[in-house]
């Protein structure tokens, strides 16, 4: 994943010093795009070990429309622990917005179900979009959405997807985000009998936290290795019926993990 390392190097060498919500301090750039051809391999970074297990369980949690941490804790996934309240709830974050966006008349919109219908019956639509940026509910969320909007695109039986991410934690968050959306595209493509195309990632405020700079320098010294392949072992009846054991990663040979503290 040379694209990721090139962006990391750009932020490290040319990023502007900024203050931030967490008071940690960042080096930041604004606006960048990366493209990943999913037919060339699954984009899971190899210059450090990335915890695919957490990525899979988090995505299944989102797809379920869940916002309570209990499901993640049951499966020993801790990536949201810093933001929970005393009841283990995170407010109307991604899963709620994807599956049950509230409307003015009190009803709900299942954006993902609508997207699946469009991909199957009207794949040329320019409205195959899912948004998590519900302005009316942001203050109720434990953390405002970072990856805010994604759009699917079908051409000649090939499925691509573009994500806009308003805020990007380059060292800890972005590797998860890239792999999570790549996983989602694999699942959607299987459900819709489409071939894999590109994942296009577009970032807004792309930053390295100052307490991640030593780890960044270490990672930039490492050479990327061949990408693994993602194998989906069965085809469930719908997008919302996948299970963790449906996924198998072949050929993942990363460098050792690099630990870093999350900025809260």
Curated annotation (Swiss-Prot):
Annotated pathway: Pyrimidine metabolism; dTTP biosynthesis
Residues the record lists as binding dUMP: 21, 126-127, 166-169, 177, 207-209
Catalytic activity annotation: dUMP + (6R)-5,10-methylene-5,6,7,8-tetrahydrofolate = 7,8-dihydrofolate + dTMP
Catalytic-site annotation from UniProt: 146
Enzyme Commission number(s) from the entry: 2.1.1.45
Binding of (6R)-5,10-methylene-5,6,7,8-tetrahydrofolate, residues: 51, 169, 263
Record's subunit section: Homodimer.
NCBIfam families for this protein: PRK01827.1-3, PRK01827.1-5, thym_sym
Family: Belongs to the thymidylate synthase family. Bacterial-type ThyA subfamily.
Protein name: Thymidylate synthase
Lineage: Bacteria, Pseudomonadati, Pseudomonadota, Gammaproteobacteria, Candidatus Palibaumannia
Gene designation: thyA
């Amino acid at each position: 994943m040379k694209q990721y390392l090139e962006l990391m190097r750009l932020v490290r060498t040319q990023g502007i010093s900024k203050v931030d919500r967490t008071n940690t301090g960042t080096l930041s750039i604004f606006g960048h795009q990366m493209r990943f051809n999913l037919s060339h391999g699954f984009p899971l970074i190899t210059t450090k070990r990335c915890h695919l297990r957490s990525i899979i369980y988090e995505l299944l949690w989102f797809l379920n429309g869940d916002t309570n941490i209990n499901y993640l804790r049951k499966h020993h996934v801790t990536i949201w622990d810093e933001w929970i309240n005393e009841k283990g709830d995170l407010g109307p974050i991604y899963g709620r917005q994807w599956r049950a966006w509230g409307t003015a008349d009190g009803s709900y919109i299942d954006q993902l179900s609508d997207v699946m219908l469009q991909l199957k019956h009207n794949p040329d639509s320019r409205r195959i979009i899912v948004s998590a940026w519900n302005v009316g509910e942001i203050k109720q969320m434990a953390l405002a959405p970072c990856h805010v909007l994604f759009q699917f695109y079908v051409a000649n039986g090939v499925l691509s997807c573009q994500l806009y991410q308003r805020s990007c934690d380059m060292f800890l968050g972005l590797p998860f985000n890239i792999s999570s959306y790549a996983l989602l595209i694999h699942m959607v493509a299987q459900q819709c009998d489409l071939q894999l195309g590109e994942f296009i990632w577009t970032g807004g405020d792309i930053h390295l936290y100052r307490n991640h700079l030593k780890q960044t320098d270490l990672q930039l010294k490492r050479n990327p290795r061949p990408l693994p392949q993602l194998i989906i072992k069965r085809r469930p009846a719908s997008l919302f019926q996948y299970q963790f054991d449906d996924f198998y990663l072949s050929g993942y040979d990363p460098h050792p993990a690099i630990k870093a503290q999350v900025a809260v």
